[in-house]
Amino acid sequence: MALGRALSAAIVGVTATIVDVEANVGPGLPRIQIVGLADTAISESRDRMKTAVANSQLHWPKTKVVVSLSPASMPKAGSHFDVAMCLAILTASSTDPLVRQRLSETVLLGEVGLDGSLRPVAGVLPVLMAARRAGLRRVIVPQGNAAEAALIDVPVDQKLGTPRMSVLAARSLAQIMGWVNDLVELPSAVSVAEAQGTGASESAAVPDMADVCGQPEARWAAEVAAAGGHHMMMVGPPGTGKSMIAARLPGLLPPLDAGQCVQATAVHSVAGGVFHGPVLVPPFVAPHYSVSRSALLGGGSGMPRPGAVSLAHHGVLFLDEASEIPASVLDSLRTPLEEGEVRLVRARHDVHFPARFQLVLAANPCPCGAEDPSSCRCLARVRMRHLSNISGPLRDRLDIFVHTRGVGAVLGHAGEESTASIRKRVVAARERSAARWSRAGVRARSNRDVDSQVLRREFPADDAAMALLAAYLGNGDVSQRGVDRMLKLAWTIADLAGASRPGLDHVAQAFELHGAPVEVAA
């Protein structure tokens, strides 16, 4: 009997756990048995691996093979275990200490083709981060994943000045076997990505705000939303630019920093699909109004996949025709909006997906879309019921409400301000708020993220503005959460204006954006 070992990883959500792959080659009829809560993709790899080994001019054992994936209690899914299982089987009879040492320090990822080539797999970034946490020396990925793997920040040994973990890229099973036996060298993922020209690919171009005709109130609302990370809702007749403004909101946001880029790219990697390069700008996700709860939050049979809210992590989630989305689906957004993550409970495990996004809702004022109630053809009860699916608790979590005007009210506008011009003010406001929260020791990426109690206690508006907030709360026209959101809005407006503290005018503008009419004494 002979025993081979290799390392791979199991991915649950956007977190990976290192998995020990053991292969026992012993007497018995020629067959392979895989144990350890493996899914269908892993179980079906038997014939694929055997054919790939034969076509790579390598030797497959002609006896019984038992492959164990541990920890056995953890569900495992995906074809990325192929390479690790092949290497554990092929090296089971090896007595070379170098082979054993290399495999004990290396995480192997990749799906094998029938010709022995390695095919790219999903979830490379979470595995790299898990290997880095575990202190392993290297990770080998398919060359098709080189650009994604090149994003990881590899720690450096302070004494030796060399990387503590290397990320290598291989094109075939035979090449990895040659490396294991110290016959060939594998290139780094960074060098392969540079040769492929995909290591620094840009995300799709964001449309310009100058394309939006008129709508000064909605444009201003989008600027405030971008500066403070606030959620917003637009209501107006069809064709007034609601979707255009929402699609241009990511262009007003600052580019993602290195950490945000890795996090957002990791979510898209776990979701699968073709890798088009790192997520460098805030993503924009706009599912159809027929979206289901599982498509919005994530889920699916087997290992859950991230939904639209997670794909919009560090970006914008736009739900057009919000009045057509079932109330149960919309209400499922309440917890992610508050906590910044999605928790899916399964029988064997819980899955967590990050979901820190800006929500933008858009809807027509009524089914017929008329701007003026006098010209509306809908029955009164139908008009009143039109937006009833947007519950009070969800409305309470929105910061900005804005009405877009009909086409006749915006004709003749030209030379509107560009995205680049607005973004300069947004970036300046964000830098101003970030410096303020940093000096105070408050952990927040934007004004929206500041704890409400800290804001009320340590960062109130001036006395007149706070009195106005208290009066509005006392009238019962808004909840305490609504007042907190207005105070955050006031801070964002003050940051855009370059003020050191929100005043009465800033609070009045916040009331207007929040949808509460306010009269300000001269």
Predicted segments, located by residue:
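Short beta-strand elements
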Residues: 19-25, 296, 399-402
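Conserved alpha-helical scaffold flanking the Walker A/P-loop in AAA+ ATPase domains
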Residues: 223, 277-278, 283, 294-317, ...
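The Walker A (P-loop) glycine that initiates the GxxxxGKT/S ATP-binding motif of P-loop NTPases
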Residues: 236, 298, 321
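Walker B catalytic acidic pair
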Residues: 314, 320-321, 332
